Amino acid sequence: MALSRPLPSWLRKPLGKASEISTVQRLVRQYGIHTICEEGRCPNRGECYGQKTATFLLLGPTCTRACAFCQVEKGHAPAAVDPEEPTKIAAAVATLGLRYVVLTSVARDDLPDQGAGQFVATMAAIRQRCPGTEIEVLSPDFRMDRGRLSQRDCIAQIVAAQPACYNHNLETVRRLQGPVRRGATYESSLRVLATVKELNPDIPTKSGLMLGLGETEAEIIETLKDLRRVGCDRLTLGQYLPPSLSHLPVVKYWTPEEFNTLGNIARELGFSHVRSGPLVRSSYHAAEGG
């Protein structure tokens, strides 16, 4: 049953310094680029900006999927790929003095390479302008093989560019994949993480789950075991918060104590880096391996 009560106290958090948030917002407008921090209204964005970390959203603000939890635009034709986007993002990284950057993207099932090439081009542009900046990738699943490149080929392009970490979020337990992740599958996401390890075992892999959609503790633990079976190194666990009334409702607010328990279970299962808490998101404290 969905919850309609007010947010628990542990989910209320100040946004951080207004000056840091406004600086990033101004640069985003200036360069015509996008961040998932702003598009997804992340509660941690002020904290991350203060730590010189940001997550850039590649390939425009419109997704070809329609996941029921996500704030990102969907439902109409995506924009043409901006060939200047890598250069613009690199300029923003340099201006902000970012030490750690996460690159993610909307799903672009309409493109022959599903957007993999834009990840590679953006990594190259950032490294040219800011050679000391580390780059983490948070990719879609590249499972729509209608184009010229298979899922494995798309992933291989990015792995060859040697990101500091390769992140792909499983998002929820097996039973809830259909209603939560329209267009994605549990097996396809596990295959992304397995493929990265097959191509380069030295690149750390990472995944994340949203809790509060109706999953049980037993289902969460089974999902963590599945992630470890494909060699996933790092994990984030956070509370699902619907961006609007038209998104999937919350079924349960997991307490900080429950998150701590799950985090300890994850460490016992062998994850090297674990961030588990109500306001944790997939890029939260990413520079620390979280």
Swiss-Prot record:
Protein residues bound to [4Fe-4S] cluster 1: C37, C42, C48, S283
Subcellular location as annotated: Cytoplasm
Keywords: 4Fe-4S, Cytoplasm, Iron, Iron-sulfur, Metal-binding, S-adenosyl-L-methionine, Transferase
Occurrences of domain Radical SAM core (ranges): 49-272
Domain of life: Bacteria
Xref: Gene3D superfamilies: Aldolase class I
Major site of localization recorded for this protein: cytoplasm
Alphabetical list of InterPro entries matching this protein: Aldolase_TIM (IPR013785), Elp3/MiaA/NifB-like_rSAM (IPR006638), Lipoyl_synth (IPR003698), rSAM (IPR007197)
Biochemical pathway: Protein modification; protein lipoylation via endogenous pathway; protein N(6)-(lipoyl)lysine from octanoyl-[acyl-carrier-protein]: step 2/2
Binding site for [4Fe-4S] cluster 2: C63, C67, C70
Gene Ontology terms, MF aspect: 4 iron, 4 sulfur cluster binding; lipoate synthase activity; metal ion binding
Cofactor entry: [4Fe-4S] cluster
Family as reported in the entry's similarity comment: Belongs to the radical SAM superfamily. Lipoyl synthase family.
Protein name: Lipoyl synthase 2
UniProt source species: Thermosynechococcus vestitus (strain NIES-2133 / IAM M-273 / BP-1)
Encoding gene (name): lipA2
